């Protein structure tokens, strides 16, 4: 650990050989980055605990798994910046926060001629911007799961473009605090489109959002976000008209191909565990963006911090700092696939997150746009991971999943029964 802490600067001249300490660090970390797939296979076929094997000198999974993940993502972006000549890389809040921190840490030694920015945007803030006209509200059921909302909670999301009497119009025909189903969601769309949509308020909201976004997207830009359907990037491109290429970890449907925004993904396929389970390790611990006004982005209530996740994030940034301090500009010449560098973290999400004690402290990771389905999905992911290690009979698995859903949505279960 003391050796890793030493500030070992490598000259830019590629002919200068590595010293003993640098070679040792290279063996323990660079080889570590390129052999995760083998560690995963070892656990599958030999019954070994790959996460324990991947820890370096009793480091936590935050250093060995999440640290390598952030390092690999940041190096992927660094290579793309050098190849494509981007003037600016904007990281989208809030799951781009730690990738931004890792990229800036590495760029202190790489010295790429690129600016970085942090754009506060979220599903909740971007949702009203997707309805320039009242007729566009017909796409609302395609943009979010309306059955996870009540009319009251969904009206809260659409408040920036709603008339003063929108609530009264909805309350006259719909129970405001009851979850919507396949029929009532279209009633909500009809009522809000006819009586609740305010075109003037939309114009003002769009003006405020554009005033916030435009200064950040001058010249040839790239954006980074975890994923998954380019909703935010589409809004940004429409409002700013900028030359933007979106970089995301992966997609989970064919929707991004239809949005018209050029994008590149780190993963060629969608991983087994994603969304809330992944994002909680990458999030800025603070408040989500809930909208825009004349002063810029409007923030909501701050999240309750998770000490386990915060410790992993701190350890991960130590890994990035150690790699930057040890190898310097030679990082650009390291030959490894960033996907391999991410494999340990993927394996951790698949098998180790429950044992690590990492839990979702806040059910609403991106404002309120996901309803309360976030916690349900996290519980189901935990159940799936446990069953992968200790398979249960099919009838028991179905009963277990039904019990989780019953605890969060008893009305839907009663309707099905």
Model-derived regions, located:
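Long, low-complexity, Lys/Arg-enriched
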Residues: 1-417
